[in-house]
């Protein structure tokens, strides 16, 4: 067997030996009902996209307080992408029925203008109507109405931002999607789910012992993860709406690194039940049925299905150092994908299957890299010293990862071309192992 370097040992089994290897003792986990989490967030953004679309977002009329808040969420969503340049729309006086003075807005530098109205109905629900104007072509690009409670208005704002993003760029927006991550506060670990902007965090699971490797089901209704509560790592599938969960990999040895098949029926996992860590497939519904995929003389871990469900990307040290490979579900010969550098781990593949994302060690630093699978061209997306756990947004345009800032682990994001970066700091804890959820509607 090839020698396993300390660095690869750190990364093996999705990082739990790196961080928690000394913590394999009798554990006690407290599973909680779906509940709000209290977190103070700070978002910092730097860089701009190669193309910036000039857009004005007017405050929504009639209900000034809610209309202003609605517009602020939309502006913040678009700003975080780095693809939009906001044009001042203060004092526009527009409502959803206004006639747009296209030439005037064009003179202000806005190629696009979003505006609308929000009113409270007799049933207490809010009616939101929005329009998107193209000031260059002097026409309406989009117009739609929403209805929701006061608590749902932020979600409505994200939906409007999604529509604006798609109408202007041609790419589906991700502002209405969710993210999951592990938050560590003191000696407590929380598996949290939040909106894509980090707001509205909810606790899915709280434990005094480590929770690692969260992975979204394709429909966004469940999370698979590894919990140590039984005295060893066990893979669970957790239904978010009910907090019900089942163990799906609880074999002898370590059970780790769950990844969903595209149809949501199976999970690829890394198991040591037969010796070294190898890749297996188990049912997402539980049970003892499983199928071994890899049989190598090295350590195989961190599996991920390709979008077509026909093969698996994984990390292995079979060539001497950790590199990324691809194999069919029949377990045939694996094909090596990464050749730059001696250390590449934590693979993720883009939703369209064209790009590989991974952690690359370069000049002693762990950085997020992307590989064009057609050309073989590698791009280093980040410049941190210890960047970990990359995850694609469901539209493939952004990448979520964990970074170290001022000695603390924070949530970070970068555009898929590396030009725009953002960090989201939780002021009373450390964020680990983020993963971006799928489109759900």
UniProtKB/Swiss-Prot annotation:
**Primary location group:** periplasm
The Gene Ontology biological process annotation of the record reads: cell division; protein import
**Positions of disulphide bridges:** none
Keyword hit for Cell cycle: yes
- Record-level GO cellular component terms: periplasmic space
Q: Which domain of life is it from?
A: Bacteria
Quote the subcellular location field of this record. Answer: Periplasm
| Keyword Nucleus attached | no
Q: Which Gene3D superfamilies match?
A: TolB, C-terminal domain, TolB, N-terminal domain
Keywords per UniProt: Cell cycle, Cell division, Periplasm, Signal
| Any Pfam family | PD40
Where is the secretion signal located?
Answer: 1-39
Q: Which NCBIfam families match?
A: propeller_TolB
Give the protein's function: Part of the Tol-Pal system, which plays a role in outer membrane invagination during cell division and is important for maintaining outer membrane integrity.
Q: Which family does it belong to?
A: Belongs to the TolB family.
Complex and partners: The Tol-Pal system is composed of five core proteins: the inner membrane proteins TolA, TolQ and TolR, the periplasmic protein TolB and the outer membrane protein Pal. They form a network linking the inner and outer membranes and the peptidoglycan layer.
Protein name per the record:
Tol-Pal system protein TolB
State the organism of origin.
Bordetella bronchiseptica (strain ATCC BAA-588 / NCTC 13252 / RB50) (Alcaligenes bronchisepticus)
What high-level taxonomic lineage is stated for the organism? Answer: Bacteria, Pseudomonadati, Pseudomonadota, Betaproteobacteria, Burkholderiales
* Gene name of this polypeptide: tolB
């Amino acid at each position: 067997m090839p020698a396993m370097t300390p660095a690869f040992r750190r990364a093996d089994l999705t990082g739990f030996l790196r961080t928690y290897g000394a913590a394999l003792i009798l554990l006690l986990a407290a599973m909680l009902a779906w509940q709000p989490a209290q977190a103070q967030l700070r978002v910092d953004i730097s860089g701009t996209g190669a193309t910036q679309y000039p857009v004005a977002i007017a405050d929504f009329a009639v209900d000034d307080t809610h209309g202003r808040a609605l517009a602020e969420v939309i502006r913040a969503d678009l700003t975080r992408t780095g693809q939009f340049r906001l044009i001042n729309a203060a004092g526009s006086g527009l409502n959803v029925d206004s006639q747009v003075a296209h030439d005037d807005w064009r003179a202000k530098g806005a190629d696009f203008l979003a505006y609308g109205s929000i009113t409270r109905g007799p049933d207490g629900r809010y009616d939101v109507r929005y329009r998107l104007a193209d000031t260059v072509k002097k026409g309406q690009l989009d117009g739609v109405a929403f209805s929701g409670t006061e608590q749902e208005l932020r979600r409505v704002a994200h939906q409007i931002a999604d529509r604006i993003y798609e109408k202007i760029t041609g790419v589906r927006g991700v502002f209405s999607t969710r993210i999951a991550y592990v938050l560590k506060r003191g000696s407590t670990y929380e598996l949290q789910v939040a909106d894509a902007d980090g707001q509205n965090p909810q606790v899915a699971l709280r434990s005094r012992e480590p929770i690692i490797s969260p992975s979204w089901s394709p429909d966004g209704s469940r999370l698979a993860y590894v919990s140590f509560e039984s005295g060893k790592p066990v893979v669970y599938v957790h239904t978010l709406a009910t907090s019900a969960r089942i163990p799906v990999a609880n074999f002898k040895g370590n059970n780790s690194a769950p990844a969903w098949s595209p149809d949501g029926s199976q999970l690829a996992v890394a198991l040591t039940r037969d010796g070294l860590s190898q890749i297996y497939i188990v049912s997402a519904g539980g049970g003892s049925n499983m199928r071994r995929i890899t049989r190598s003389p090295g350590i195989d871990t961190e599996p991920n299905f390709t979008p077509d469900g026909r093969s698996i990307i994984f990390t292995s040290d079979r060539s001497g150092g950790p590199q990324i490979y691809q194999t069919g579900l029949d377990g045939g010969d694996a094909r090596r994908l990464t050749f730059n550098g001696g250390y590449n781990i934590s693979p993720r593949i883009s939703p369209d299957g064209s790009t590989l994302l991974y952690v690359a060690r370069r000049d002693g630093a762990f950085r997020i890299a992307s590989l064009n699978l057609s050309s073989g061209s590698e791009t280093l997306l980040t410049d941190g010293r210890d960047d970990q756990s990359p995850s694609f947004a469901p539209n493939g345009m952004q990448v979520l990862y964990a970074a170290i800032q001022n000695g603390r682990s924070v949530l970070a994001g970068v555009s898929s071309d590396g030009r725009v970066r953002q960090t989201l700091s939780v002021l009373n804890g450390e964020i680990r192992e983020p993963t971006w959820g799928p489109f759900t509607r």
